[in-house]
């Protein structure tokens, strides 16, 4: 498989004008669609690429995303060189990248469903605590996805949020509890899985476009291939803020996009 086999690339990142995405794609010589949903870009890119394949607009589509700690800190908070004291609720942007090739040929892992999220704003203003701001969006998309796919929480082996981190994931669990839903071991957050918050100096956990993408490729896909998981739901979360809005004391609108992966036993045995 080579770049010449690709019909379209769908990708995004955290930098202004999708700088990293466009610099990467310029060497591929493949039609490219840039997408942005902050840290929910991973699910948006994969979902969009899946739709292009499903609708017959592409035989093979590449979905990719990336993030890097230093430029993200410079753009959304403060340059690392400033040595600004961070709050305990701050997350650590993951330096990483991931890509997935989607096609019509049956594979052991399939994208079963994709749900676009709505923008949710609970009037949170603290840019150093974006996990709390994003939790309501994750809950909203979870409900939408379950309704859209006629599924229940019991149908999934894993339900993973993108990067709510310790504070935001705890808030989501509280919101679920208020609805009578117990967030058991099937629930987790990619920002808590990619780092060990008890041993690494990452404050509240991981974040960034690469957070959910790297966990999906490295851990979720491994579990699906091994047969330890059958259906996994990824709720990638994004805080749609800019420093200009923060300077103006505006609130932080958030969004979550859902991607559901399923193990295909027929493809695994063939």
Spans of features found by a protein language model:
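Short coil-to-beta-strand
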Residues: 8-17, 109-115
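Condensing-enzyme catalytic core mediating Claisen C-C bond formation in acyl metabolism
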Residues: 79-144, 148-151, 184-195, 201, ...
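Phosphate/pyrophosphate-binding loops at sites that engage ATP/ADP/AMP, CoA/4′-phosphopantetheine
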Residues: 1-7, 141-157, 223-224
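Claisen-condensing/thiolase-fold acyl-transfer catalytic domains that form or cleave C-C bonds
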Residues: 12-16, 22-59, 67, 131, ...
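Short secondary-structure capping/junction motifs at helix and strand boundaries
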Residues: 3-5, 56-64, 109-111
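Long, hydrophobic, well-ordered secondary-structure blocks that form the structural core
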Residues: 43, 63-74, 79-80
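Short, well-ordered, mixed-charge alpha-helical segments that flank or form enzyme active sites
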Residues: 18-19, 69-74, 119-123, 241-243
């Amino acid at each position: 498989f080579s770049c010449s086999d690709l019909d379209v690339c769908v990708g995004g990142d955290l930098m202004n004008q999708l700088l990293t995405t466009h610099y990467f794609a310029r060497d591929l010589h493949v039609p490219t669609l840039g997408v942005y949903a902050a840290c929910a870009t991973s699910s948006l890119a994969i979902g969009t690429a899946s739709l292009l394949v499903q609708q017959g607009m592409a035989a093979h589509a590449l979905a990719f995303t990336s993030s890097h700690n230093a430029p993200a800190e410079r753009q959304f908070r403060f340059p690392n060189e400033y040595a600004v004291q961070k709050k305990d609720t701050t997350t650590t942007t993951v330096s990483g990248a991931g890509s997935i090739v989607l096609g019509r040929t049956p594979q052991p892992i399939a994208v079963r469903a994709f749900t676009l999220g709505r923008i949710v704003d609970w009037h949170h203003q603290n840019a150093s605590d974006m996990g709390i701001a994003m939790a309501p969006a994750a809950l909203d998309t979870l409900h939408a996805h379950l309704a859209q796919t006629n599924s229940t929480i019991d149908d999934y082996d894993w339900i993973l949020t993108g990067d709510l981190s310790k504070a935001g994931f705890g808030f989501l669990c509280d919101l679920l509890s208020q609805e009578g839903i117990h967030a058991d071991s099937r629930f987790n957050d990619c920002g808590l899985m990619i780092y060990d918050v008890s041993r690494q100096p990452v404050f509240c956990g991981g974040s960034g476009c690469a957070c959910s993408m790297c966990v999906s490729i490295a851990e979720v896909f491994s579990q699906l291939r091994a047969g330890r998981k059958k259906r996994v739901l990824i709720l990638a979360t994004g805080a749609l803020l800019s420093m200009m809005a923060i300077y103006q004391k505006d609130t932080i609108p958030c969004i979550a996009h859902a991607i559901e992966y399923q193990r295909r036993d027929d493809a695994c045995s063939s």
